[in-house]
Every structure is written in C-alpha cells, then in structure tokens.
C-alpha cells in the first residue's frame, strides 16, 4: 500500500514540474521576443533620426548652393555690364571717327563741286565742262559703288548673324521641346507608378490591419485561456498538496495501527480492512482524476506551443513583408533622387535660358539706345516739315532717280555735242528731222550701241548726199535713177535696223513713244532733275552739317528690322520661360507630394511592424492614425 501511494504521489509531481518548465520556457521566449521587438523599435528610431539628419544636411547644402549661385549670377552680371560699357564706348568712338571721316570726305566733295560750279558759272569752254562733268560723274559713281559694296557686305554680315541667331534659337527651342516632352513622359510614368504603389500599399495595409486585428483577438483569447489554465494549475497544485498531506496522515495512521493488529479482536480487524479498502478506492479515484487533469493540461500546453509557433511564423512573415516593402520603397527613393537630379537639370537649363534672355534684353536695350542716340543726332526739320519716314523714303527715291537721270544727262550731253558739231559743219542748213532726234535720244542708251551708229550714218548720208528719204528736203534733180535706188536700199536697211532698235527700246521702256511725247518727257525730266538735284544738295548739306551719311537710312531700316526680330524673339522666349517655370513649379509640387507620401509610407510600415510585433502598443490610436 505504501509503495503504491508513493508511486502515485511521484507521478503528479513530475507532471507539474514539466508543466512549470514549459511555462517558464514560454515566458522566456516571450521576454526574448519583447526584447527583440524593443531592439527593432530602437533601430527604426535611429534610422528615422538618420533620415531626418540627411534631409537637414541636404536642405543646408541646397541653401548653400543657391546662395553661391546667386553670388555667381551677381558677379557675372557685373562683369557683363562692365564689358558692355567698354564695348559701347569703343563703338561710340569708332562711330565718331567714321562720322568725322565721312564729314571730311563730303566737305572735300562739296568744295570740288563748288569749284566746278564756279567754273561752269564763269562760262568756261564746253570741253572743260564735259571733262569736269565726266570726272564728277566718275567720282560719284566710284563713291556710290564703294558705298554700295560696303552696304552689301554689311547686309550679308547681318544676314549671316541673323541666320546664326535663328539657328541657335531653333536649336534651343527644339531642345526645350524635347526636354519638356521627356519631363512630361517621366512625370506621367512617375505619377502612374505612384498611383500603383499607393493602391498596392493601401491594399497591403488593409490586409495587414485585418490580420493584426485577428491576431490581437487570438492573443486576447490565448491570454484568457492561459489565465484560466494558470488558475487550474494552481488549484491542482493545492489539491495535490492536500492529497499529499492526507496520504502522509494515512501512512502514519497505518504505521501506528499495524503493530497491535494481532491483539485486536476479529471485529476490529474486519473494520480496519474495510476502512483500508475504502481508502485505497478513494486514492485510485483521485489518481485517475489527477491523471486526467494532467493530460488535459498537457494537451492545453501543446496547443499553446502550437499557437506560439504559429505566431512566431506569422511574425517572421510580417518581418519578411516589411523587408519586401522596404525593397519596394528603394526604387521609389531612387526615383525621387532621379527626379531631384532632373529638377536640378531643369533649374540649370532655366538659368541658361534666363541668361540668354538677359543677354537678348541687354542687346535690345543697346539697340534702342543706339537708335535713340542716332535719332537725337539725326533729328532735323525738312524743307516742308515732313516726317522722318517720308524723308527717308524721299531720299531713297531721289537716289534711284539720280542714278536713272545720270544716264539721261550723259545721253543729253553727247547729243548736245553732236548737234553742235553738225551745226558747225552745216551752218545755216535745215535742222535734222524729229526722227533723228528720237533715234539719237534713245540710240545713245548704254545698252543699244548699234542704233547710235546707225543713226549717225543715216544723219551723215542725209547731210552729204541729200537723199529723198525725208519729205521736208528738196530732191536733187541731177541724181540718177541708179543712185536713187542704191540710196533707197541703204535707207530701207537703216530703217529696218532702226525699227529693230525701236522695238528693243519699247520692250525696255514698256510702251510706245513718239517725238512730241519724247520732247515733253525730256523737258519734264530736266525740270525734275534740277528740282531733285536741288533737293539732294539741300539734304546733303543738312547731312554734312549733322555729320551723318546717306547710308544712315539703310542702317536705320536694318536696325529697325533687327530690333523687331529681337522683340519677337524676346516675346517667344518669355512665353517659353513662363511655360518652363509653370512646369518646374508643378514638378516641385509633385516632388514634395512624393516625399510626403514616402514619409507616410515609412510611418505606416513602422506602425505595421509595431502592431505585428507588439504587446506594448495600443491598437485604437494607431488605427485612427492610419
């Protein structure tokens, strides 16, 4: 009996010891998990502090760079202004030198022309007049050709400069368009990626929150069960101690009553046997009940261990997911860095465009100042109080008329010399017919030399031979029929040649001409020539007094055209600059939103990790924050 009771008492002790050991192991594991969770929490806090420090350092560097860039801009502006001032002074000096040189040249020409005019007024010989006229014409022609070549060269240079500026502007516009298209594409891709990541993160957050809620409910249920089981184990231990005490008492009683058993009467022995059987039966039932309870506790402990392993697996899965989210956030961080680099490139390009715009505005201001200075120097009152534009147009028109009428003057001078020679030879003979005048007037054109020779031959034949070609002259009755036929054939050939020359002249002039119209046009042209020469002399005197040249008109027109082109370019560049500034502002706003979103995702990730690991964090405030 004592051996059986001892063996039955040792079995519950071993089982309760194993239960206590398992509980202690579970508590040690729980403390280790909490320690690891606290370590991870401290690591996350340190990483967040490092991130904040890195952001502060980046902001400080950005401010330092912006201050340095502003200083460089100020220095560059000062240097440019100094260079432009020096260039402006050099150009002003050069312009003054050229104006003085042209004034000297014009004064010399005026003196020479005045001398020739005095000679003409004094009544010099015709040969001297023609020589002086030819010299003056040749010199004027040479000066005009030189001026024209110089102006053509300047026009070609300005065209080349304009072409280069247009090419640079087109290249700049194409590059800006390409950059804008790349930025739009990158912005759209970035926006799509952000929306996709946002949807995935929200989906994962909802799923993780649902899982966290379920895990929390499971943890609460397990804690309740653990408390119930701890109470049951405590109660079982108390029952075990009570049973041990009862067993000890029973054993002591058996030991005390075992020696006088023989001396007892038989009735008393039967009673003792009955009592011993009842005690043994009670011990067996208690042992079975304890064994059942221990088996139940073992099953509960196994269930708790299984749930603990499941929770550990879920924790590992959550850690893996947190690492995966960190890996997914790395491309976003890299994209953010790339966007920052693109923003910096855009800032540099905008700065370059601003510098170009400033240079163009400075050039425009210089051109305006130059035009205003020239206008102030060249501002004068015309003879009829005409405006400056009408004076310019009149000067251009008069220049063309002078070029056309110089040829007419040459023709008239040659015709006058020929008529003087013919008058000397003929004396009091008849005047040449109007046909010869018409032929000679148009025959001495620079482009029809054949008509000139033919008219001279026809005039000579008319003067010497007295042919019957003109009805105004009397026919010689002594001439023979053969001579008349020969002269008639010669005159018909000359007449056909003159018709061909006249047709060519009609093609050149563009209309039909007769002698009376020619005389009227000649008189009108002479009057116009004198009037234009007077106007030209007046204008040249005014220009010489002002120290300017006739090329000022063309220069001013070219400058006005270039100024208009520059204004249009400046307007286009301002529009492009405003567009780029708006795009830059949109990109900055988007970058700030992305940074805020990244921080939000980091906070959510840290909250998810804490909620998945955590026993020390309340659930409801974090849920409200999410």
UniProtKB/Swiss-Prot annotation:
Subcellular location: Cytoplasm, Cytoskeleton; Membrane
Tissue: Specifically expressed in brain and testis by spermatogonia, spermatocytes, spermatozoa and Sertoli cells (at protein level).
Record PTM Phosphoserine, positions in chain: 382
Phosphothreonine PTM positions: 470
Coiled-coil regions, chain positions: 13-255, 284-413, 490-604
Keywords assigned by UniProt, alphabetized: Coiled coil, Cytoplasm, Cytoskeleton, Membrane, Microtubule, Phosphoprotein, Protein transport, Transport
Keyword Protein transport assigned: yes
Annotated GO CC locations: cytoplasm; membrane; microtubule; microtubule cytoskeleton; ribonucleoprotein complex
GO molecular function, one term: kinase binding
Location of region: Disordered: 1-25, 452-481
Residue span of region Mediates association with microtubules: 1-365
Modification after translation: Phosphorylated.
The keyword Amino-acid biosynthesis belongs to this UniProt entry's keyword annotation: no
GO biological process, one term: protein transport
Region (Mediates interaction with TYK2 and GABBR1): 365-626
Topology versus the membrane: Peripheral membrane protein
Pfam families: JAKMIP_CC3
Entry's family note: Belongs to the JAKMIP family.
Subunit-level organization: Homodimer. Interacts with JAK1 and TYK2. Forms a complex with GABBR1 and KIF5B/kinesin-1.
Protein name: Janus kinase and microtubule-interacting protein 1
Upper classification of the organism: Eukaryota, Metazoa, Chordata, Craniata, Vertebrata
């Amino acid at each position: 009996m004592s051996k059986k009771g001892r063996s039955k008492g040792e079995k519950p002790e071993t089982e309760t010891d194993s239960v206590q050991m398992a509980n202690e192991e579970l508590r040690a594991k729980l403390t280790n998990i909490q320690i690891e969770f606290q370590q991870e929490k401290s690591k996350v806090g340190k990483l967040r502090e490092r991130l904040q420090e890195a952001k502060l350092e980046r902001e400080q560097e950005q401010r330092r760079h912006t201050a340095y860039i502003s200083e460089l801009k100020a220095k560059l502006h000062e240097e440019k202004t100094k260079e432009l001032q020096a260039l402006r002074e050099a150009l002003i000096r050069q312009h003054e030198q050229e104006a003085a040189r042209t004034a000297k040249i014009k004064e010399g020409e005026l003196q020479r022309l005045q001398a020739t005019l005095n000679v003409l007024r004094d009544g010099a010989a015709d040969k001297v007049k023609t020589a002086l006229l030819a010299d003056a014409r040749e010199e004027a022609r040479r000066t005009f050709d030189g001026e024209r070549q110089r102006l053509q060269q300047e026009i070609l240079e300005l065209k080349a400069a304009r072409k280069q500026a247009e090419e640079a502007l087109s290249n700049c516009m194409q590059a800006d368009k390409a950059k804008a298209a790349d930025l739009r594409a990158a912005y759209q891709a970035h926006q799509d990626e952000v929306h996709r990541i946002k949807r995935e993160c929200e989906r994962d957050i909802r799923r993780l929150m649902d899982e966290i809620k379920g895990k929390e409910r499971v943890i609460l249920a397990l804690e309740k069960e653990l408390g119930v089981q701890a109470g049951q184990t405590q109660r079982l231990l108390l029952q075990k101690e009570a049973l041990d005490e009862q067993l000890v008492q029973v054993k002591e009683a058996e030991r005390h009553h075992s020696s006088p058993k023989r001396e007892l009467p038989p009735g008393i022995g039967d009673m003792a046997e009955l009592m011993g059987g009842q005690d043994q039966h009670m011990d067996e039932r208690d042992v079975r009940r304890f064994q059942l309870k221990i088996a139940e506790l073992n099953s509960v402990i196994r269930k708790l261990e299984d749930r603990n392993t499941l929770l550990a697996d879920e924790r590992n899965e959550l850690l893996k997911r947190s690492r995966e989210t960190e890996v997914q956030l790395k491309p976003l961080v890299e994209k953010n860095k790339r966007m920052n680099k693109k923003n910096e490139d855009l800032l540099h390009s905008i700065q370059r465009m601003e510098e170009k715009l400033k240079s163009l505005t400075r050039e425009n201001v210089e051109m305006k100042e130059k035009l205003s200075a020239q206008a102030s120097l060249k501002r004068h009152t015309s003879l009829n109080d005409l405006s400056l534009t009408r004076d310019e147009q009149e000067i251009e028109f008069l220049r063309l008329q002078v070029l056309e009428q110089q040829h007419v003057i040459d023709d008239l001078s040659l015709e006058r010399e020929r008529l003087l020679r013919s008058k000397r030879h003929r004396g009091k003979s008849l005047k040449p017919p109007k046909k010869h005048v018409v032929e000679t007037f148009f025959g001495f054109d620079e482009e029809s030399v054949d008509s000139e020779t033919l008219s001279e031959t026809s005039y000579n034949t008319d003067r010497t031979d007295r042919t019957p070609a003109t009805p105004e002259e009397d026919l010689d009755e002594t001439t023979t029929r053969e001579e008349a036929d020969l002269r008639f054939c010669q005159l018909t050939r000359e007449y056909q040649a003159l018709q061909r020359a006249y047709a060519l002249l009609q093609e050149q002039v563009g209309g039909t001409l007769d002698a009376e119209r020619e005389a009227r046009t000649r008189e009108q042209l002479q009057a116009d020539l004198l009037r234009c020469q007077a106007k030209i002399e007046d204008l040249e005197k005014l220009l010489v007094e002002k120290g300017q040249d006739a090329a000022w008109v063309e220069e001013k027109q070219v400058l006005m055209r270039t100024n208009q082109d520059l204004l249009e370019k400046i307007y286009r560049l301002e529009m492009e600059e405003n567009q780029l500034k708006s795009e830059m502002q949109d990109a900055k706003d988007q970058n700030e939103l992305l940074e805020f979103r990244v921080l939000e995702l980091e906070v959510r990730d840290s909250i998810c990790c804490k909620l998945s690991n955590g026993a020390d964090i309340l659930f409801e405030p974090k849920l409200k924050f999410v």
